Amino acid sequence: MEAALLSGFIKAILPRLFSLVDDKHKLHKGVKGDIDFLIKELRMIVGAIDDDLSLDHPAAAAVQTLCMEDLRELAHGIEDCIDGVLYRAARDQQQSPVRRAVQAPKKLQRNLQLAQQLQRLKRMAAEANQRKQRYTAAAPGQHGQVYSSAAAQVDEPWPSCSSASDPRIHEADLVGVDADREELLEQLAERQPEQLKVIAIVGFCGLGKTALAAEAYNRETGGGRFERHAWVCAGHRSAREVLGELLRRLDADGRSFHGDSDAGQLCVDIRQQLEKNRYFIVIDDIQTEDQWKSIKSAFPTDKDIGSRIVVTTTIQSVANACCSANGYLHKMSRLDKNCSKQLLSKKACPERYSHYKQPDSAAILKKCDGQPLALVTIGEFLQANGWPTGPNCEDLCNRLHYHLENDKTLERMWRVLVRNYTSLPGHALKACLLYFGMFPSDHPIRRKSLLRRWLAEGFVEPLSSSSNIDSTAAFNVLMDRNIIEPINVSNNDKVKTCQTYGMMREFISHMSISQNFVTFFCDDKFVPKYVRRLSLHGDTVVNGDNFNGIDLSLVRSLAVFGEAGTTVLDFSKYQLLRVLDLEKCDDLKDDHLKEICNLVLLKYLSLGGNISKLPKDIAKLKDLEALDVRRSKVKIMPVEVFGLPCLIHLLGKFKLSDKVKQKTEVQEFLLKGKSNLQTLAGFASNGSEGFLHLMRYMNKLRKLKIWCTSSAGSTDWTDLREAIQQFILDEKEANIGTRSLSLHFSGCSEDAINSLKEPCYLSSLKLHGNFPQLPQFVTSLRGLKELCLSSTKFTTGLLEALSNLSYLQYLKLVADELEKFIIKVQGFPRLLRLCIVLQYPTFPVIEEGALPFLVTLQLLCKDLHGLSDIQIECFKHLQEVTLHSGVTPATRQEWVKAAKEHPNRPKVLLLKSVDTAESEHTDVDSVMEAVKSETTEYSIAPEGPEQVNNKMQLDHGLESSSVLNKQNNFADQSSSKDQLHYSFNNMGLSDVSCCE
């Protein structure tokens, strides 16, 4: 594990080492020679590490660990050297010519120090390489390697299971699975349709997928419903091995099986065994789509027989592939509080203590996070440590990340976590996962902010290439593998906030500490060695004594949650910071900004606390890519910000300075088209700012949010109209990409909007204001896929005009009421998601055959009565219905009944809104509560009412596939009940895609 992460880190710093050879740094010839040596040496080290990783087993654990420590120290030393040169070069560029002349002697001295530093690094590289060769060569074994049980623990695959029972989870451990089991058994027994049906069970490791499949298998094999049945494990096996095992189980006599048969022949033999028989096959732990593609051709698809295949997998895209045609996808959910407590108590408390008052287990239940395997193994661990009379949960929790790796009782849980980590393809994904350690365990993490921080750290690239992954792709892979979970998902199916599971968080903490990846200061727990990423959270204020001997100048990332103290907030001690997250720092003040503006390598900056004004010196941050002031009190954005050459994302709600009316360097910068700004979300305007003239020169702007504010002098909105017109102008390019506009125009004249003209292009539009008719430019928009409108009332004419938007995929309407309107067969031909939020239940009439591709329907009105004449059986692709949580129980029951009678059996969900429609500072605005359509009882908020407004998450999970693999043809997915599972972030308008 350490080797892979280190190899990736060295690969990441090599390009920066190359940059030092560039003539612009004016290094001495001898210094350049030393840098060339280090480049070649690091390449060889990376090659040696990659060779070790490519073998079937790692090198001797002790030697390998020491070698990795040597190389990590070397790599960090090289990175410090590189960034030190870049830092000094950036500071020199900001000095006047006179100042640079005065500093010339000091520069010569620095060059001498650099030469000495490079010589030291050369010696370190040579010595580390020699030690590695000397001691690994001395270790006997295959390929000159030695193996240990500790190393084998990491890479040894799961034992293949030869029966239907899961060797890791006994039947006695099954708690809270009744509803899942009944749903699965119903899918197996369902007679319509009669052709082959594939049921995919998907979820994070340890949620009980195999145990659930085993429950169904054991019941069905004894029932006589199926003529042939078999169970095989696919984990860590080739398709040929899986097919061979399956054939052995089907052919009791062994006459059909030949050990030298290839996959194609095995498929033929299996088909002969299964043809014209009703069969039930379980394939446990499928890991790739290619593996499934090679296996599935072995199964006959005879009609009028009704065979069933159940597959289990941890990977969402694999589950989607398995049940893409006539399939059913079952997403595993975690146990609720009561079931979690029951399972933990069963495993932790010996029978002789059944009447003993058990200690408070809240802390350990939070760590287990409803994961059955975690509850079982932690329960056994507690019992081994004397529960309930021994140490309390709090004490054991504090060192749980240590016990995970070192305690035999927790070995099963540790192996699951290690497997998830080591299976990630490439070093970048491992670094991205470990970066979650920067956040407190119960802190929702904003996806876009996270991606920008990954970019600032250099883990990923802005765009994918043959050798590097981009930030969005990295996030999607982690989602696809169910390693991270979405908490809050916007109406248009975009993940807004996420977090990791409880035990995965413990694993990340352990790995981050052991790899010196993140240093934590949390409730007085501080492990100083050298600090590259520093995260402070808890109620403890850091004072100077805590930081004795710690060099803060090497910190690359700093995040503060709570109070930091004067020592941490002394930014004169930092030099190499790239990421600075202070939006939740309680003791941040305007005075701190002076030194922050000297952090010339800074790429990501988020501010909160009591910050009310940005200084002009922010212009020094030439490398800054993202500036987020949404949680601050900044009301005026200094014009100097718009002159930052690397700035891509500017977030907040601010007014713009009028100083650009005067000729300035910023104005000249913008006029030359040098701005890289892509996101401006957003600013408040009264239509008269001189800045609006310059927006036309922001050629790369892709996301714009504007609040129109009325004032005494705001009678002429010409400048604002022209700025918007320029932004939406259609250049008639084949692929413009995404372009989003969010416009709150209640404070300005409607003429400013109605006078916008074609040709125009937007992919997403949000309009908030009063408009009796649809603005003309909306109907002429090319590329419009997402539209969100908010007004007091929508007229029939406006609604009919909307139905002609032929490319619209998502529509959200928020109003008090709608005039009478019929959605006809020809209307909204490509609409996938429809959300209507009303005060009064004036929903439209939907003709039979209309909305042919609708996947999700959200009817959010607490006074909704029954089905409101909406016949959901007409929506052939419907996967989900969402209602306001305030509807009556009778209305809920009607929708549950209708959903159960629908061929797709769509989910029925309740949305409980939080009144934060216009809040720019709310991480999570709402909570989705699932109603299990299989029962008459509503499983609403199983985590208890006290957590509804805190955790804000889906108890029944959600499919990351919708983020990863957008399917254009939903016809292939019509029978997959849980293929797309969404949540929505509030009933207001701040969730549309053009908003942050």
Swiss-Prot record:
Keywords of this entry: ATP-binding, Coiled coil, Cytoplasm, Leucine-rich repeat, Nucleotide-binding, Plant defense, Repeat
Summary of the tissues where the protein is detected: Expressed in leaves.
InterPro entries annotated for this entry? Apaf_helical, Disease_R_plants, LRR_dom_sf, LRR_R13L4/SHOC2-like, NB-ARC, P-loop_NTPase, Rx_N, WH-like_DNA-bd_sf
Coiled-coil segments: 111-138
> Molecular function terms in GO for this entry?
ADP binding; ATP binding
Query: What sequence ranges are listed for the domain NB-ARC?
Result: 180-462
**LRR repeats located where?**
481-503, 504-528, 529-549, 577-599, 600-621, 622-644, 698-722, 759-781, 782-804, 805-830, 851-874
Q: Positions of the region Structured coiled coil (CC) domain?
A: 1-176
Q: Does the keyword tRNA processing apply?
A: no
Q: GO CC terms on record? A: cytoplasm
| Localization in the cell | Cytoplasm
- Annotated SUPFAM superfamilies: L domain-like, P-loop containing nucleoside triphosphate hydrolases
**Per its UniProt record, what Gene3D superfamilies does this chain match?**
1.20.5.4130, Helical domain of apoptotic protease-activating factors, P-loop containing nucleotide triphosphate hydrolases, Ribonuclease Inhibitor, Winged helix-like DNA-binding domain superfamily/Winged helix DNA-binding domain
Reported effect, C349F: Abolishes resistance to M.oryzae pathogen
Query: Where is this protein primarily located?
Result: cytoplasm
GO BP annotations, alphabetical order: defense response to bacterium; innate immune response-activating signaling pathway; plant-type hypersensitive response
UniProt function note: Disease resistance (R) protein. Resistance proteins guard the plant against pathogens that contain an appropriate avirulence protein via an indirect interaction with this avirulence protein. That triggers a defense system including the hypersensitive response, which restricts the pathogen growth. Contribution of RGA5 is required to recognize the effector avirulence proteins AVR-Pia and AVR1-CO39 from M.oryzae. Acts as a constitutively active cell death inducer that is repressed by RGA5.
Q: What family is it from?
A: Belongs to the disease resistance NB-LRR family.
Q: How does it assemble?
A: Forms homodimer or heterodimer with RGA5 through its coiled coil (CC) domain.
The protein's name: Disease resistance protein RGA4
Gene transcribed to yield this protein = RGA4
